[in-house]
A protein has these predicted regions:
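Non-heme Fe(II)/2-oxoglutarate
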Residues: 1-81
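A residue-level signal for beta-strand positions that form part of recognition/binding surfaces
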Residues: 13, 87, 123
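Catalytic core of non-heme Fe(II) oxygenases with the double-stranded beta-helix
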Residues: 91-154
């Protein structure tokens, strides 16, 4: 399993690649989900907030969970806490759109999987009085503590 740890504020951020292409079935399912979306502040979010429960994403969820356990083991080192996935959704952000700054106060770990990132323009920014930008690549996982405000910009 290949990944790197990037420390900001000095909080480590876990970045790893999916390590494979998205299957045609997964892409088709994402395209279908893109037809059931609603407006967010400046982009769109899927109506379904449990997409990883769909059978088509079973393999993806398993791969994600493997990295989630690794993050928990290496970064948090919580001995008596077993992480689990509560919600999962898709955000659709076009050129000149962004994903608003937010946090996930009801979670301990949050993550983003980039399905189609433009490394020249796309970035995730983390805020804590100052901010840190990370340029994602397509198929990157990015896990962070849920208390960190973050937004996606291009």
């Amino acid at each position: 399993m290949k990944y790197k740890i990037d420390a900001i504020f000095p909080t480590p951020i876990y970045i790893a690649s999916l390590g494979r292409e998205f299957s045609k079935t997964e892409i088709k399912a994402m395209d279908k989900i893109n037809k059931s979306i609603h407006k967010n502040e400046s982009n769109y979010i899927s109506d379904d907030s449990y997409i990883l429960e769909k059978p088509v994403f079973k393999k993806l969820k398993k791969e994600l969970f493997t990295h989630l356990l690794e993050y928990n083991k290496v970064i948090t080192q919580w001995k008596n806490v077993k992480p689990y996935i509560t919600q999962s959704w898709l955000n659709f952000t076009k050129t000149d759109e962004y994903h608003h700054i937010h946090e996930h106060p009801n979670s301990m770990i949050s993550g983003v999987l980039y399905v189609n990132a433009n490394p020249e323009n796309d970035m995730i920014r983390f805020f804590n009085n100052c901010y840190k930008r990370i340029k994602p690549e397509t198929k990157n996982w990015i896990f962070m503590g849920s208390e960190y405000c973050h937004g996606l910009f291009n």
